[in-house]
Regions:
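Claisen-condensing/thiolase-fold acyl-transfer catalytic domains that form or cleave C-C bonds
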Residues: 1, 87-144
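Active-site/ligand-binding loops adjacent to catalytic centers
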Residues: 5-104, 148-202
């Protein structure tokens, strides 16, 4: 909607290619757009547990509006597609983004997973610029990140942690030691412990 308005106002001249992203556990929009136009019939789905809980909707009431906007976008010359990703890909992408300082929630991870899948499918070239929609903070769904680090996902999610991405939380200074130290001593002890963990001591 916003891109169509910007084009009408002359702010932009070309419409970028757009992709929606859905999990395999909640994918009614992907199922609709994965078919040729003449064969498309919208059907709701029964959702399965998803880490992207805000998008875990099997029968979105907004679908008629989505379809109307997509139709208008394509008539105006824009391209639209939908990518489907696994729960594993969503969590791996969430952790990957967070490891690089882009603090995202699982819906943001779903968005990045979609970009990676689109590249894998050849729908986005390696040198192309992409803008991802990620508007929530990691703290909103921090429990899923902790499950990833501690390998405690229930089996219905289908998520197994990638050891290379795992960053399990650990105490820097235990509670008993903290209680014994003054504020200044605690600060020094914590800083020293962090430096040692990061192998920065003595550098």
């Amino acid at each position: 909607s916003g891109l169509l308005k910007m084009r009408r106002l002359g702010i932009i001249s070309d419409l970028p290619r757009l992709f929606g992203v859905q999990s395999e556990h909640a994918d009614p929009v992907w199922r609709y757009y994965s078919k040729p136009k003449a064969e498309r019939v919208y059907n709701p789905v029964t959702v399965r547990p998803s880490v992207a809980q805000a998008a875990m909707i099997g029968n979105p009431v907004s679908f008629p509006r989505v379809k109307a906007l997509v139709d208008a976008y394509e008539v105006a010359g824009g391209e639209f597609g939908v990518v489907r990703v696994t729960e594993q890909a969503i969590m791996d992408a969430t952790i990957l983004a967070n490891r690089h300082g882009h603090i995202v929630c699982t819906q943001g991870g779903e968005c990045l997973a979609g970009l990676l899948k689109a590249r894998e499918e050849g729908r986005v070239a390696a040198g192309e610029k992409a803008v991802l929609d990620s508007t929530a903070h990691a703290l909103k769904f921090a429990g899923f990140q902790n499950m990833y680090f501690t390998d405690t996902f229930p089996p219905e999610y289908g998520v197994a942690p990638d050891a290379s991405l795992a960053n399990r939380p650990s105490l820097v200074v235990d509670a008993a030691e903290k209680a014994r130290l003054s504020a200044e001593e605690f600060t020094r002890a914590a800083a020293k412990a962090v430096a040692e963990r990061l192998e920065l001591a003595g550098k």
